[in-house]
């Protein structure tokens, strides 16, 4: 499977962790059995799907203000993947 060049996820209407996981799953092509939690997110991005070359998280500042804990966890997981699996990780743009 080849990696997409760019995936953009609009976070401006995300107001709950469930909405966030649904948006991530839809945009990144997670399987239907995705568990909608951070452990499942890690499993999905590191072994179930090919991450895009670039991932743009649009509306990040307002999203991070609304859901700071979720934003911190997402940012941490994406940074961890970039450190541990640089060839598979997306270059993330927090826009």
What residue ranges belong to the model's regions?
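Positively charged, polar, low-complexity stretches
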Residues: 1-95
């Amino acid at each position: 499977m080849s990696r997409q060049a760019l995936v953009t996820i609009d976070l401006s209407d995300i107001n709950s962790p469930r909405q966030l996981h649904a948006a991530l799953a839809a945009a990144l092509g997670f399987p239907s059995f995705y568990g909608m939690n951070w452990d499942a997110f890690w499993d999905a991005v590191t072994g179930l799907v090919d991450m895009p070359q670039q991932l743009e998280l649009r509306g990040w500042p307002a999203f991070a203000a609304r859901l700071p804990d979720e934003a911190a966890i997402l940012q941490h997981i994406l940074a961890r993947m970039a450190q541990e699996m640089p060839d598979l990780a997306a270059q993330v743009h927090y826009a």
